[in-house]
Amino acid sequence: MRFVIPSKGRLKDATLELLERAGIRPSYLDSRALIVPSNKPNLDLVFARPEDIPWIVESGAAEVGITGHDYVLESGRDVAEILDLNYGRSKLVLAVPRDSGIKRPEELPKGFRIATKFINIATDYFEKKGLDVKIVKVSGSAEVMPGIGAADGIIDVMSTGTTLKLHGLTPIDVILSSSARLIVRKDLLDDPRVETIKLMLESVLRASKKKLVMMNVPDEALDDVLKVLPAMSGPTISKVKSEKPMWEVIAAVDEDEIADIIVKLKNAGAKDILVLNVERLIP
């Protein structure tokens, strides 16, 4: 089985980190090696440009892949997005020079030149708006084009907006929001190998939002402590061998709520509270 992942750009490092946490590691890393065995039997990692990954998966050269939602849409390839991986978040925006005076797409004059590598998305966008612009294809940094007179505006990926600001550009419309996605050939949607890959990644994503809270609770405080815990399916409770009646309580808690919950647990009578990272979470 082949798993194609980004070889460069904003998605590469985050993808390798996610795979590592899911227990999938390349046998070695070499920028010259584009097909690398993994530590999993019969699973090879293929490194490719993010924009090429949709057609690599569709063609059957790889069964699954990771790339950006924007690249999937731009490619027009017949693949299925089966998991939002919650990293590489960005927006595809229409941007113009700050001093142009243009505030809305409808204000673009006829023949306005738009530099972008997202030709298909841009064409569809302007056709739906009924705007007569000229789309200029670029393969590198679109944001420099208005500054050198090669274009009047751009459609490009924006993460923080710093690069646009640096080049004197301002966004006037958000075309779409994007993030990294796990994609698969549609005829493999029910393939057990694909389900295994999805489950491995999904368990890590779920775990990243949770903390495991363990505590000892005196018998008389148990009811009050249980009222505090918003566990997924109820906390795990077991009797502790001690001089006074005591319970061990374990629960998975949302990371964003952990600080408030610890205070409430302490006030409710919980003792010896431990907060642990969760590596994987499978509901």
From Swiss-Prot:
<dbReference type="GO" id="GO:0003879">
    <property type="term" value="F:ATP phosphoribosyltransferase activity"/>
</dbReference>
<dbReference type="InterPro" id="IPR020621">
    <property type="entry name" value="ATP-PRT_HisG_long"/>
</dbReference>
<keyword id="KW-0368">Histidine biosynthesis</keyword>
<keyword id="KW-0460">Magnesium</keyword>
<dbReference type="GO" id="GO:0000287">
    <property type="term" value="F:magnesium ion binding"/>
</dbReference>
<comment type="function">
    <text>Catalyzes the condensation of ATP and 5-phosphoribose 1-diphosphate to form N'-(5'-phosphoribosyl)-ATP (PR-ATP). Has a crucial role in the pathway because the rate of histidine biosynthesis seems to be controlled primarily by regulation of HisG enzymatic activity.</text>
</comment>
<comment type="pathway">
    <text>Amino-acid biosynthesis; L-histidine biosynthesis; L-histidine from 5-phospho-alpha-D-ribose 1-diphosphate: step 1/9.</text>
</comment>
<dbReference type="InterPro" id="IPR013115">
    <property type="entry name" value="HisG_C"/>
</dbReference>
<dbReference type="GO" id="GO:0005737">
    <property type="term" value="C:cytoplasm"/>
</dbReference>
<protein>
    <recommendedName>
        <fullName>ATP phosphoribosyltransferase</fullName>
        <ecNumber>2.4.2.17</ecNumber>
    </recommendedName>
</protein>
<keyword id="KW-0808">Transferase</keyword>
<dbReference type="Pfam" id="PF01634">
    <property type="entry name" value="HisG"/>
</dbReference>
<keyword id="KW-0479">Metal-binding</keyword>
<keyword id="KW-0963">Cytoplasm</keyword>
<dbReference type="InterPro" id="IPR011322">
    <property type="entry name" value="N-reg_PII-like_a/b"/>
</dbReference>
<dbReference type="InterPro" id="IPR001348">
    <property type="entry name" value="ATP_PRibTrfase_HisG"/>
</dbReference>
<keyword id="KW-0067">ATP-binding</keyword>
<dbReference type="InterPro" id="IPR018198">
    <property type="entry name" value="ATP_PRibTrfase_CS"/>
</dbReference>
<dbReference type="GO" id="GO:0005524">
    <property type="term" value="F:ATP binding"/>
</dbReference>
<comment type="similarity">
    <text>Belongs to the ATP phosphoribosyltransferase family. Long subfamily.</text>
</comment>
<dbReference type="GO" id="GO:0000105">
    <property type="term" value="P:L-histidine biosynthetic process"/>
</dbReference>
<dbReference type="InterPro" id="IPR015867">
    <property type="entry name" value="N-reg_PII/ATP_PRibTrfase_C"/>
</dbReference>
<dbReference type="InterPro" id="IPR013820">
    <property type="entry name" value="ATP_PRibTrfase_cat"/>
</dbReference>
<keyword id="KW-0547">Nucleotide-binding</keyword>
<keyword id="KW-0028">Amino-acid biosynthesis</keyword>
<dbReference type="Pfam" id="PF08029">
    <property type="entry name" value="HisG_C"/>
</dbReference>
<keyword id="KW-0328">Glycosyltransferase</keyword>
